[in-house]
Amino acid sequence: MKLSLLLAAPLGTLAADCTREFLKSAADSLLAAQAAGDPSLLKPVGSTLEYNENLKPATFASGILKTALKVDHSRHSLDTTQCATYTELISATGPKPYVNGYQLWFTNGSLTRFDGIISSTGDWLFNVTGTLHWASREAWTEIPADKRDTREAIKAGGDAYLDIFSDKSVVVPWGRPCSRLEGGAYTGNGGANDRCDVGIPDNVKLTNRRYVIDEVMGAVSIFLTFGSLADSHEFRLEGGKLRFVHTITPMGGNPGPSVGKGKGKGKGFRRRGEVL
């Protein structure tokens, strides 16, 4: 399904320099489309569009946007350098729970690539109650201009975290506190001593990385291949140090471990590398 270029033109004209305002408007239209189950509300869409879900080709007709989801929590990252967005969406109170990540990529003011990482019951450590509980308590606020890290530093921080899965000699800019929300499990309790350097497996390569970087939020979204699985890792850095890590890992129909029905607090639970 594609919108006409006539519909896309007004926003496309405004987006000539890819402003934060344009990107937020487009990302908000994604939320509207997902809430209504109506892909035509996603704007502006180009005359050609590459559409992927869980790193596999899909279409609007068969994809997640055809399912109306109650949006209980959402957050955007806006990358004006690459003209791209990342959106985290948690749907906890609808008929079927979801925790999804979306990267949207724009060319000449129109959407030309859609990537979704879609997770639900049975996926890695899935517990939407825990995800919503912790995500809604974290502070992902704008970082003052004089305290922002560079794009290069933000990307390097995310890459270092991912690289340590295959090379334990990598120096990762761990923050303290640093909290990881993995599925619905949390490596702490929201306190000053939270750590996210626990439960990291060995000898697992995280490849095919695609980045959306927002210096204003200190955030980088990375879609990647985790062994054989589609995966989303998102990081927030503050003062050059990792502060928050969010992960989404669909299991491709192979049920993953759960963390029960509680808030998902735990340490040392990350063992994906042993089962791929």
Regions found by a protein language model. Give the residues of each.
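Fungal secretory targeting signals
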Residues: 1-17
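C-terminal and inter-domain tail/linker signature
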Residues: 13-276
